[in-house]
Amino acid sequence: MSGRNCLTIVLAAGEGTRMRSSLPKVLHPVGGQTLLSHVLAAAPGGPGTSLTVVIGPGHQAVADEAKRVRPDVMTFVQDERLGTAHAVLAAKEAIIRGADDLLIAFGDTPLISADTFARMRAPLRAGASLAVLGFHARDPAGYGRLIVTDGRLTAIREDADASPEERRMTLCNAGVMAFDGRTALRIIEKIGNANSKGEYYLTDAVGLVAELGLTAAVIETGEDEVRGINTKAQLAEAEQVMQARLRKAALDAGVTMVAPETVFLSADTSFGRDVTIEPYVIIGQGVTIADGAVVHAFSHLVQASIGRNASVGPYARLRPGTSVGDGARIGNFVETKAAVLEAGAKVNHLTYIGDAHVGAKANIGAGTITCNYDGFNKHRTEIGEGAFVGSNSSLVAPLRIGAGAYIGSGSVVTKNVPDDALAVGRGQQTLREGWAKRFREMKLLARKQKTG
C-alpha cells in the first residue's frame, strides 16, 4: 500500500475450551481448510510484509499449520493467557523490528477478507494512529460498542458498562485493529490490567490514543465477515456462510449446479469452464475439475483431479491421489485411491481401483477389484492401454496387464499378462444334466418322511 510495509500479528493462543475438543480451536476446519489458514491466506503478503502467529504453550500443531500455509511466518508463544494486549506483546521481538503498519487479527475469524485488511490500513496512511474494525450487529447484546464522536473513535464501551443510550447503538467492536507502527509499541505497553480479571485488554488502546491526542478511526464491515468461532454451533454457522460464498463464486465462474445448496465445496476447489456438478456432491480439499467435466450426484472427491470432459459418478468416491484423464469415466459405486486413469479409460460400475495405473481407453468391467494390500504393504497394478478386464475379476498386485490384453470375466489374476494376450484364471465349469431336478426330488422326499 503506497510503499508502506506491514507486520500482521495473528492471535491464536486460545485453548477453545467451549469447542469441547482436543484439537486446538484454530485447527478446526471450515470450507475444507483450518480456521487459521483462512486468516493467514487473507493477511497481507508479498514484498514489504511480514507475518507472525502467537500460539499457546504446547501448540506445535498450530505452528506447523501456520508454516504450511505461509512458510515465511514467525511464531511466538504466549506462556500465560493474560489478555489480548499481553498476547500481542508476546511478539514484541517482531514489533521492534519496525513496520509502518501493524495489523492485529484473530485466528478464529475465518471469514475475514484480504480487502478488509487492506481497508484497515487506509486510515493509517491518512494520519490515524489506530483503526478498529466495526460492524452493525443484528443483536448487539454482549458486544463492546464503538463510541464515535465527530467522526473519531473515542472509546470502546463494554456492554456491562454501557449506558442505556449506548446499549441502543449497533456499531460493535470486531476486535481487529491496525496501528501506526511508529506509536504502536508505546501505546500497547501502556495498557494496564486494572480490571476484575487482571488481564491486559487491547481495547484499552482506544482510550490511550485519545489521551495522547492521537486519532483513532473505525472501518466497518458486515457482521458475517467477523464471526468468531468459540463453539461447534458457531463453527457450523460459519460453514454455512463459507459454503454460500464458495457456491456463489463457482456459479459466477460458470459452473452449472442444479441444486447448489446441496453441494459442498472446499476453499481450494478449482473449476474449469462448463463444469457441471449435480446435487449432493461433496468436494474436499485439493480437487481440480477441468473444462466440460461432469460430477454426477452423490459423489465424494478428495485430493483428486478430473480431466476435460470426464465423467464421475453417480455414487463415486475419489480418494487422495486419483487422477481421471480427459474423457475418462468413473461410474456408479466405484472407489479409487492413488489411481491414475488415462484419457478415455472406463471404470463404469461397482469397482475398486487402488494403487493403480489404467492406460488410455482401457475398460474395467463391473465388480473388478485391485487387490493391493497383502496385510503388510501396498502393491501396484499396471493396466496397459486398450486392455479389457472382464467383470468380477480380482487383480492381485503387484501385477502388470499388458496393452490390449483381455482378462476373462471372473478371473483371479496373479501373474503378469503380456500385451494382446488372453488370461483366464477361474475354475473349470462342471455340468451335470438333470442334477437339479433329482436334488429337489430328494429334498422333497426327505421333508415328507420327516413330517410323517
Swiss-Prot record:
Disulfide bonds: none annotated. Pathway: Nucleotide-sugar biosynthesis; UDP-N-acetyl-alpha-D-glucosamine biosynthesis; N-acetyl-alpha-D-glucosamine 1-phosphate from alpha-D-glucosamine 6-phosphate (route II): step 2/2; Nucleotide-sugar biosynthesis; UDP-N-acetyl-alpha-D-glucosamine biosynthesis; UDP-N-acetyl-alpha-D-glucosamine from N-acetyl-alpha-D-glucosamine 1-phosphate: step 1/1; Bacterial outer membrane biogenesis; LPS lipid A biosynthesis. GO terms for molecular function: glucosamine-1-phosphate N-acetyltransferase activity; magnesium ion binding; UDP-N-acetylglucosamine diphosphorylase activity. Mg(2+) binds at D108, N230. GO terms for cellular component: cytoplasm; membrane. Its main location: cytoplasm. Binds 1 Mg(2+) ion per subunit. Homotrimer. This is Bifunctional protein GlmU. It comes from Nitrobacter winogradskyi (strain ATCC 25391 / DSM 10237 / CIP 104748 / NCIMB 11846 / Nb-255). The lineage of its organism: Bacteria, Pseudomonadati, Pseudomonadota, Alphaproteobacteria, Hyphomicrobiales.
